[in-house]
Amino acid sequence: MIVPKYFEDFDHLHVNTMPNRAYYIPASRRMEDLVENREASDRFFLLSGDWKFRYFTSVYDVKEEFFTEGYDTSAFETIPVPSVWQNYGHDHHQYTNVRYPFPVDPPYVPYENPCGAYVRTFEWKKQEEAPRVFLNFEGVDSCFYVWMNGSFVGYSQVSHSTSEFDVTDFLKDGTNTIAVLVLKWCDGSYLEDQDKFRMSGIFRDVYLLARPEKGIRDYFVKAAPDASYQNGEVSIAITWNDGEPQEGTAKLFDTENHLVAEAAFGGDTVQMHVKDAHLWNAEEPYLYTLVLETAGEVITDHVGIREIHAKDGVLYLNGVKIKFHGTNRHDSDPVTGFAISLAQIKKDLKVMKEHNINAIRTSHYPNAPYCYQLYDRLGFYVIDEADNESHGTEEIYANYTSWEEYAKNWNKLIANNPVFTEATVDRTQRCVERDKNRPSVVIWSMGNECAYGCTFEAALKWTKEFDPTRLTHYESARYVDDPKKYDYSNLDLYSRMYPSLEEIKKELVEYGDKPYIMCEYCHAMGNGPGDLEDYFELIHSEEKMCGGFIWEWCDHAIDMGKTIEGKKMYAYGGDHNEYPHDGNFCMDGLVYPDRTPHTGLMEFKNVYRPVRVTGYDAEKGTLTIKNYMNFVNLKDYAVLGYEVLVDGEVTESGKITDEALLELAAGCEKTIPLAISVPEQGKCALKVTWYQKQATEVLPEQFELGFEEVPVKTKDNQNQKAKEMMKRPEGTASFGWKEDDHYLTVSTEQFSYTYNKFTGLFEEMCYANQNLLDRPMELNIWRAPTDNDRNIKNTWMRAQYDRTVTRAYETKAKEENGCVEIETSYSISSPALQRILAGVIKWTIYSDGTTDVHVEAKKDPVFPVLPRFGLRLFLPESFAELTYCGLGPVESYVDKHQASYHGVFHSTPAEQQEDYIRPQENGSHYDCDYASLASDRAVLTAVGEKTFSFQASVYTQEELTEKAHNYELKPCGSTVFCIDYRQAGIGSASCGPMLLEKYQLKENEIKFAVRLKPELL
């Protein structure tokens, strides 16, 4: 082996690295653009770009000293830096959530440990004003050795943290050669078991910094308001190169470039007072510009003046109670993997701002350093998480008989093992030291799912002593094994993952001395989450509940190109023949891999809208509104638009922009005048929409921030079109009858309907020589399981809800009052099992072909709750024009419809498909008055006296159940029209609590009625 085995040595976490410091880019002058153009600094030299690269399947296969000067790399390929080598045909992709991808035998990793040799040359000219040169790696997975001009520079690990080396003595004027050996695994990999694809390489920028011989090495800015929250106090602690202080000046400028504070310094501290300070918060992210100037160097940074603290279990920022409406964010892209460019992170943040997200947890490692400058600038509260996760230790083979044994077993291998204390604390320090000057960072998190013990007690102690101005977080602190008493004195928050609402209420009492935070909740996997509104209500009704972070931001996937038909192909766990893997559990984001929003993100946006309507009095013409923002007055942020919808159609609209009317302080409520014309009859609603008042960096003027639909009473509160369609059809006809043991055919000159006496449903329906059914009608209790059904799915399949058949017993038919009435007793059952439910189905056929169905069902209570109950019709695919009046335009369910409103919408069955990468139930619409599907000749409408749910699709639920990827789906050749009494809610039980009882389809007695009305066009 050509390198020492530091990669399996707890005593050598780093070799020759510089002490940790805050991130900044020095220059010879003030920098105006700290994020987008850091290369403008004359002291910054980017080494990212094309490198020579060779892949080895094992570090033991590296025989030649490729790092020597003049080594022939002509046989090497070219690879971009930053990147991950799995995306360039080397090794293989692997997604695993908890389980380690190698045997659990720390500090050892497999001999078959892949590695990559990187080499590049660059030109260098020594700067007399800045002769010292430092080499920075912002992210390398998992560990690396580095050489300059053939000489060993050093070694480092901790994939998502910066490693800096002094290379002054290794550089020469002219051509220089840098060589890096990156290993896939090292002893640090036991602490990097995050839920993600496992990728390797130099995945963040590499650069050189030229610096003076003497000067600032590090600085720590503490900028907080005074007790009155009117003025600001800025304190800067400076660490000097070689410990030798220099003279310099510190200047603070406001956003108009006015000098607001200045101080000369020649020691270790700087103090500045800011009168009438603008305080930083996520709604008004005001930043001052700090300029630190010493001989030969200028450091430019941004400063936000703010204070975060907890008191009596309540979280405060600048003395104001705040709530986190947050998300967990991984670095993930289907093409570039972990390598996330500035443009990519800006796109993420733009979409977040568009959807009312105000907080980010950097799950589960620090982001690239410039990300935090964007968080400061755009306004996000950040939980900055250290690169610590050892979840795989939970999976080691053991026999547990109690919670205490489980926790003890998980704790003992790493979290409560002193051997890992140095590594755990090191990872925390590297996170905290680098990001300590970022005002957006309000909470330090020690890591994720590592269990608890002495290692994290030490990390928390160091963090709190080093930075008492911020709060500390670590969810796994709750995994304790009695009777050992753990030290929680340095932990500021009580944190949970995926608690139920009832658990939260209980724990708010039990642990009420600390703010309660959900570091993960409402698992956004596939079609979901479905219970956001319930969590919102609890978050904003409990002072000690400071909010939460949705799991998670984006679907993780690998771009595999396109099919022959042009369909996009994304791969997830198991698609690369890897072991172990966790399937599509990585497809759990609010956005698709390409950042197209899921309907779950649309739901989040409107649940967390900045303003809510709390009441409307149509008689008085008054609207009561509440400002849910924490700092901003409504008049400065938004304007109000409104529409009156009657039977789904807009009848009136207007705007309120008067600042006097919209004068509403944060957290306050008021009533304003808003008179509308209310019809005598019809289903009427007032839709209030909030729009961005003034453009920001990411949101344009008039951008929609959220909306509210308020029902307005009329005399009948009924949709008049539905009411008209529900009238008894006029006219009479002479019915023709044809009946045998199996079928009953009822016909007139206008239609011919064939009824299957074995099923109690129609086999064929022909209206005006137009077939209405491609296949026999069905009673339907199955849905293609959503990802959030992943647990109950097994229960449903054990009950064989996916294999049901309908059996009719006795059928009675008669012609009476100008119509035909058919009554059949029936049951639904599955092979080898007893009846699931039984009841009576009644059909009434009118002379114009209109058909009413009344279904009564009694479910055997021994069976589990149902996925759905309703009718399934297979219409010819020519019935492709959809019109409906109900909750739209996006999919909606009983617990997931805040992004929808009642209107009349036009679409097609193909457009209704919400194209989840793993196919599942999608595209349903809740609370509908009617739904019509039309061909160029005829239309079939479903309408009811009560509202119903429906779904129109080109795919069957069987196809959606069976196929593993969306690109595998094949249209069935029909338009599948599901008309449902109800569907079960969506919830978030893929990694969370069971679906709330009120959203379950748990009734054992069901009565459902709907009318099917065909018409010629």
Residue ranges with predicted function:
Residues 269-275, 648-681:
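Intrinsically disordered, low-complexity Pro/Gly/Ser/Thr-rich segments with frequent PxxP/GP/PP motifs
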Residues 172-175, 239-311, 680-723, 730:
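Extended acidic/polar, glycine-enriched regions
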Residues 87, 92, 99-108, 157, ...:
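An acidic-aromatic loop/edge-strand motif
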Residues 1-39, 88, 96, 151, ...:
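Extended substrate-binding grooves/exosites of carbohydrate-active enzymes
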Residues 148, 231-264, 622-655, 672-673, ...:
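Beta-strand-rich binding/interaction modules
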